Design a protein with these regions (language model features):
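Noncatalytic linker/hinge segments flanking ATPase motor cores
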Residues: 61-66, 100-105, 131-137, 171-175, ...
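Sec-dependent N-terminal signal peptides
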Residues: 2-12
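Catalytic domains of cell-wall/extracellular-matrix polysaccharide-remodeling enzymes
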Residues: 69-76, 97-243, 249
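C-terminal domain-boundary segment and adjacent tail
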Residues: 54-56, 161, 222-301
């Protein structure tokens, strides 16, 4: 609590030049442990995009084409992705089937990237520019990491890093299975609380690792929880002094050009990666409270 209060009090000192890019993973839907390609996918997409349209903010969405392409067909998936494009999203590649690079043969993983851009390219009418690693796993060895980076460059891709990592998928799964409105409200309230705590944490950690606050990139998922919470999340970002920018604009920050050599069987924020690459110990972000983690473990076991 003292940590949060400190940064909320200290907020005005750093608020003037803050920027954040909103990036959304697992399109057309993901993060809440339900059928990603349900018959209501069109309605869900409209609900999810409504607060983003209303706020008029830029955002990016990273697509897993595979499952929904198989269940819905190319034409229906294209219609869904066209809604995202028409709402202003920059559509990126999150692979076809969301494999873990750390335990997938390279050639198979690379093929999955190419397979994951097929419908997206039809919708955008242009090459797909950005790639987001599934699970944020970038390789267990430096050789694996560099091989993927080289392959992506050769195919015209820019890696889409994230600096503000979030456990939104945990809250989203609980929210999708809440037994009543009271439980849903409790989950929503704690989700919004921890999201602001995470912003405060990564703002401070950026200053410690990089010397100043980077133009942040926040990761969330295309879930019903975020469809319901986006107005509050956007308001929180603005209250903290953020200007919401495109991913392209955020990546103009020269700090993103700093090399990082972190390799492990973990998917973590790039702020942690840069720190570890400098030999700094990782200071982990706040966890959800015990009741959230225990409920999630019970649900997925």
């Amino acid at each position: 609590m003292r940590f949060v209060l400190f940064f909320l009090i200290a907020l005005p000192q750093f608020a003037a030049d803050r920027q954040v890019a909103i990036t959304i993973d697992d399109l057309p839907r993901g993060g809440d442990a339900i059928n990603r390609c349900s018959s209501d996918l069109l309605g869900f997409t409209q609900r999810f995009l409504r607060p983003l349209r209303k706020a008029g903010v830029p955002f990016s969405g990273f697509v897993n084409e595979g499952q929904c392409r198989e269940q819905l067909g190319d034409a229906k998936l294209a219609a869904i992705l066209r809604q995202w494009k028409d709402a202003g999203a920059e559509l990126g590649n999150h692979t076809a089937q969301h494999p873990n690079y750390n335990d997938t043969p390279r050639d198979q993983f690379f093929a999955g990237i190419l397979e994951g851009e097929r419908v997206t390219k039809q919708v955008t009418g242009a090459p797909v520019r950005y790639f987001r690693h599934p699970y944020l796993h970038t390789g267990k060895t430096l050789e694996d990491k560099r091989a993927l980076e080289q392959w992506l460059r050769a195919h015209g891709y820019i890696i889409a890093p994230i600096t503000i990592d979030t456990p939104d998928y945990i809250y989203a799964a609980l929210y999708a299975h809440a037994k009543d409105d009271a439980e849903a409200r409790r989950i929503r309230a704690d989700y919004l609380r921890i999201m602001e705590e995470l912003f405060a944490f990564y703002e401070q950690r950026s200053r410690e690792v990089l010397g100043r606050e980077i133009a942040q990139t926040v990761l969330i998922h295309a879930s019903q929880l975020n469809a319901d919470c986006l107005p509050s999340l956007i308001a929180m970002m603005k209250r903290r002094g953020y200007r919401i920018v495109s991913l392209t604009e955020a990546l103009k920050d020269p700090l993103y050009a700093v090399d990082e050599t972190f390799v492990a069987d973990q998917g973590i924020s790039w702020i942690h990666r840069w720190g570890a690459s400098k030999g700094m110990p990782i200071q982990w972000e706040p966890d959800p409270p015990k009741w959230v983690n225990e409920a999630y473990k019970m649900m997925v076991r």
